[in-house]
Amino acid sequence: MPQEFEDARAVLQKIEDAGFDAFFVGGSVRDTLLNKPIHDVDIASSAYPAEIKHIFKKTVDTGIEHGTVMVIHDGEGYEVTTFRTESGYQDFRRPDQVTFVRSLKEDLMRRDFTINAFALKEDRTVIDIFDGLSDLEHKIIRAVGDPHERFHEDALRMMRAVRFASQLDFKIEAKTLKAIEENNMLLGKISVERILVEFEKMMLGSKPNRGLEDMLTTKLNEYCPGFKDRSKELDQLTKYPLKLLENPEQVWTMIAWSLKLTPQEVMPFLKQWKTSNDLIKNVSATLQVLSMDKNDQNERLALFNAGEANVVNAIRVAQILGMNREAWLDTYQNLQIKDTHEMAITGKELIQKGIIKPGPQMGQVLNRLKLMVINDELKNESLALLNAVNKLQKDD
């Protein structure tokens, strides 16, 4: 049993000593059975919220209307949720009604997939009502009960299925896969932000090609921003070793490349996905580098504008696409300056020396100096830069 569970066993024991049932549940149990590290400890109990609050001295009402109370034990917070049933999913995401129950089976019946429907007792006994252990052994993702019902309860579960296929390298069971295809339009009811989280996790999983293939097979992509009618382009992605992708910037650069987007088209495309402005800026810069011809005369400027992290991202995406662009990093690292602030002279100094007056001309001169330094046409030294300014003014 992982240390996180060992630390929380006393919480289960205290609930059981009070006459109630308590179990570890959810993905952490699955990951424990797969010998993977766990991230969250979720506890489910037959005790109602008021009863949990009576058992423990320190509690916080984190989601009491849904049956969740945080118990503070040894300075750690553990969320304890009452066994419950759910009904009415008008938004295809959250239940309209939650009913507290005393039955573990009724609670586990509302879980998404059999591999997530385990309960683990304090004595390490695994409760497996839906043959999840068999599915875990055979690497199968299968909906609990009727897959159509599960996806109508929460349409995001369809994206979770393809995400798990990628993260775990599991196969989606035939009826579950068919139900995803038949209910794919429900994904349109889910917020883009939630789809984004699942999609990025899928693309950064250990087998992203598998997840993406399942996504295209079930046509979930038709209900994702900017992916409608782009199955052919997205399918081309599955021909590349996507497991080499390391971060969201590389994921979206790879996608932008496959959709033949220009750096300028990246912003409206990613705005649909509601990604951060930083990610949009980085993907645009990375794509700008990636789009260069091998001996592009603006190569040094593009690398300077991109910055080291985006140059590294461009090299990785190029590698995935079968291109060797390792030289870009050497070129970048040998630039005299990596930032405008590193210029050996500033506009303020030029004004103080009476060499130039404030205004548009000063900005133009400084830009020309910067470009000359970036292209190694000029040393980034005060005297050399001052001489260059005088020469530029005479020429003008």
Curated annotation (Swiss-Prot):
Similarity comment text for this entry: Belongs to the tRNA nucleotidyltransferase/poly(A) polymerase family. Bacterial CCA-adding enzyme type 3 subfamily.
Cofactor(s) required for function per UniProt: Mg(2+)
SUPFAM superfamilies referenced in this protein's UniProt entry, alphabetically: Nucleotidyltransferase, Poly A polymerase C-terminal region-like
Additional observations: A single active site specifically recognizes both ATP and CTP and is responsible for their addition.
GO molecular function terms noted in the UniProt entry: ATP binding; CCA tRNA nucleotidyltransferase activity; magnesium ion binding; tRNA binding
GO biological process assignments: RNA repair; tRNA 3'-terminal CCA addition
Keyword 4Fe-4S among record annotations: no
E.C. number(s) listed in UniProt: 2.7.7.72
Catalytic activity line of the entry: a tRNA precursor + 2 CTP + ATP = a tRNA with a 3' CCA end + 3 diphosphate; a tRNA with a 3' CCA end + 2 CTP + ATP = a tRNA with a 3' CCACCA end + 3 diphosphate
HAMAP family: CCA_bact_type3
Recorded name of the encoding gene: cca
Annotated function: Catalyzes the addition and repair of the essential 3'-terminal CCA sequence in tRNAs without using a nucleic acid template. Adds these three nucleotides in the order of C, C, and A to the tRNA nucleotide-73, using CTP and ATP as substrates and producing inorganic pyrophosphate. tRNA 3'-terminal CCA addition is required both for tRNA processing and repair. Also involved in tRNA surveillance by mediating tandem CCA addition to generate a CCACCA at the 3' terminus of unstable tRNAs. While stable tRNAs receive only 3'-terminal CCA, unstable tRNAs are marked with CCACCA and rapidly degraded.
Name of the protein: CCA-adding enzyme
First-tier enzyme category under EC: transferase
